[in-house]
Amino acid sequence: MLSEYVKKLLDVMEYDIPYTRLALMEKLGLKSNEGFRRNYLHPAIELNLVSMTIPEKPNSRNQRYIKV
């Protein structure tokens, strides 16, 4: 079952468009990096709903996230 956080994240993303972490946080009106990663981003990645553009470097400053 999807959490409300993951649903909100997916609602602000369009398919096949890469987003930065900051862009997604801005769309959601969030300020906490840790809260965003813990509640929104990591659960969506674990469920294979969002993918990283550079999976071998999860902490890359050039990392983008794509709705799949």
Predicted regions and their residues:
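C-terminal regulatory or interaction extensions
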Residues: M1-V68
